[in-house]
C-alpha cells in the first residue's frame, strides 16, 4: 500500500475517533480534553510515555510490522492505557486501521521530531523478552523494600506505595497536575498491556522512565538486578485474593471483576462487628470491589 494512502486513511479514522480528545492538530486540546484526567497526549513534541526505548527517546514504531515488544505505539493503541481514558482499540479498528492512524500521527502530528531521522533519533532498545526476571523470593522483596527508600521512590509514591508521598503538586511537562501511581492498584499502571500482574511491565517502567512526567528512568543509577528487586517488591503490593492469587481483571474495564453477590460468612450473635479493617475476622473474608461515585445534581 502506498504510504500516502496509508496516511490518508489514518487521518480519516483519527478525525472520527481521536480528534475529539487529541485535537485536530494533535496538541491534546480537543473539545473533550478538559474532561479527562490525565489529559490526552500532546503529540507535537514526540513525547510518548510507554516505550521499550531509553528515557527521552522516541518509541518503537513500524508502520507495517506490528511485532509484539517491537512496536510500542501499536501496542498502546491495541491495548489502551489502563487508568486513563485511552481505551483498547482492538475489535473497534482493524489491525490495518490502527497502523494507518499511527502512520498519520507519526508523520503529520509529531512535528518537532522525525521517526525517519535515524541520525538524530537514536534508540537504545530494552530487549525485555531476552531478560529473565529474578524470582520474587523473600530476600528479593526485602532488597526491593530497601531500594525504594534508597532511591527516594517513597517521596512520590509514599511509604506504603499508595501514591501519597510528600511530593505535592506534581506537574507533567505541559504544566498539568499528575498523580503518582498507587502500587496497590496495578491494574491502573500505564502500559500494563492488560496484564497488570506481570512484573516485566514494572521493570520496563523503572528502566525507561515515563517521558513527559516526573517519573525518571533508573537505568543509570541502578543495576539490572536492583531493578528486578524493586519490580518484585512493587508487584507484591498489588491487591490479591485472600489466598494470594491475582484478582480477576475485566478486559472491558481493566478493573477487577465485580461479584455482585456478597454472601454472609460471619455471624456474631450478640458480639460487636469489628471496626478495625485489620482485624483477623475481616482478613478471612473474600475481597470485594465495590465501585462508588458521587451524586450528580440536576
Identify the residue ranges that each predicted region occupies:
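Sequence/structural segment immediately N-terminal to covalent heme-attachment motifs in c-type
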Residues: 4-23, 73, 122, 136-162, ...
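His/Cys-centered metal/cofactor-coordination and adjacent catalytic loops
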Residues: 1-6, 20-46, 55-56, 61, ...
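Post-kinase regulatory C-tail/linker adjacent to protein kinase catalytic domains
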Residues: 122, 247-270
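A generic secondary-structure signal for well-formed alpha-helical elements
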Residues: 17-25, 81, 105-113, 151-152, ...
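Sparse recognition of residues in long alpha-helices and their boundaries
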Residues: 26, 59, 117, 153, ...
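Extracytoplasmic electron-transfer domains, predominantly the class I c-type cytochrome c fold
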Residues: 34-108, 169-235, 261-290, 296
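Short, non-ligating residues that shape and space the ligands of small metal-coordination modules
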Residues: 27-28, 95, 162-163, 224
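Electrostatic cytochrome c docking/interface patches
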Residues: 1-14, 112-149, 241, 247-250, ...
